[in-house]
Amino acid sequence: MADVLKTVWWDEVPCLIDQRLLPATLDIVRCEDLNSVIEAIRSMQVRGAPAIGITAAYGMALAAQRSTAQTSSKLLEKLAKAKALLDATRPTAINLAWATQRMLDVAQANHTLEVDQLRQRLLAEAEAIRDQDEAMCRAIGQHGKVLLAQSRNVLTHCNAGGLATAAYGTALAPIRAVHEDGQPIHVWVDETRPFLQGARLTAWELQQAGIDLTLITDNMAAYFMQQGQVDCIIVGSDRIAANGDVANKIGTYGLAVLAKAHNIPLYVAAPTSTIDLQTADGAAIPIEQRSTQEVTHIGQQAIAAAGIKVAHPAFDVTPAHLVTAIITEQGIAYPPFAEQLQTMVEAANAANAGK
């Protein structure tokens, strides 16, 4: 099994790779307090729905460690406030709120513990969230590689690799699994404007893993589909609604429409923690609006005239009818998705409750 880079971990405090600096610089950030965790998520030092969920869980554990509360009840009050602050950083990715709620639930369920014992219990839960995420990613890889068995040219968008998770990735997991089995596979990597996660992160990850790749600009994808050089598309997700509508990085919907026009399957890979059964469909998913400077600049270099009007929705929603299959750690769901997604979430919850 190939080694994969760890994205976020605990070493007395939450530690993470500053993904804004990749691939030029591999820099480790140590978050010494809750505010630094919040800033790391908001500024996209850490990004990717599962990874920010793990980071938020560590943020809750850190808030407990740093709190001067002398009783468990006071600590619970501090944790509720920490959850609210963390949840507000990135509204589209449901894994964040899922992780902070899980941490709060554990705190409430263990409120009879002495306060120091409760702090340790919370850290153990955050570590469990991290470890379970990596295990889920590897399971996604094993399930998903079956769908890629006949695909030699796969297109992916944004970064849903190890950098977006605890390790190994979601959309890149089946690609890694095929490669580890010794089968040939080639990946078309969308650069993913405006933050360039594909160019900076996915291409770098695949290169590190020794997987054949070609970097393309986003507006080249249709050309390669038209030329018959794309066998399938696989992407991650930041939130999947109960009906199977998928929120993912801006540009995913456009790829889905193109895939439908060219009869190319579109696969979505995500852990069950990304499935939001409380959100009926994509229309109810909040779409984060990010900084205009991320559009007008690349790094510190301006590429547009000063003072122009800019729109920057960070995500779009792909309707369920454009999705061929959803790959989770519990298996593969096919349309219609609603009943299967509910069953998968229930199975995952039952498995977690038994640990």
From Swiss-Prot:
NCBIfam families: eIF-2B_rel, PRK05720.1, salvage_mtnA. Catalyzes the interconversion of methylthioribose-1-phosphate (MTR-1-P) into methylthioribulose-1-phosphate (MTRu-1-P). Its EC number is 5.3.1.23. GO terms for biological process: L-methionine salvage from methylthioadenosine. It comes from the Bacteria. Substrate binds at R47, G48, A49, R90, Q197, N248, K249. InterPro entries: IF-2B-related, IF-M1Pi, IF_2B-like_C, Initiation_fac_2B_a/b/d, M1Pi_N, NagB/RpiA_transferase-like. The keyword Isomerase applies. This is Methylthioribose-1-phosphate isomerase. PANTHER family: METHYLTHIORIBOSE-1-PHOSPHATE ISOMERASE. One of its GO terms (molecular function) is S-methyl-5-thioribose-1-phosphate isomerase activity. The record marks C158 as: Transition state stabilizer. The active site is at D238. Keywords: Amino-acid biosynthesis, Isomerase, Methionine biosynthesis. Pathway: Amino-acid biosynthesis; L-methionine biosynthesis via salvage pathway; L-methionine from S-methyl-5-thio-alpha-D-ribose 1-phosphate: step 1/6. Belongs to the eIF-2B alpha/beta/delta subunits family. MtnA subfamily. It catalyses: 5-(methylsulfanyl)-alpha-D-ribose 1-phosphate = 5-(methylsulfanyl)-D-ribulose 1-phosphate.
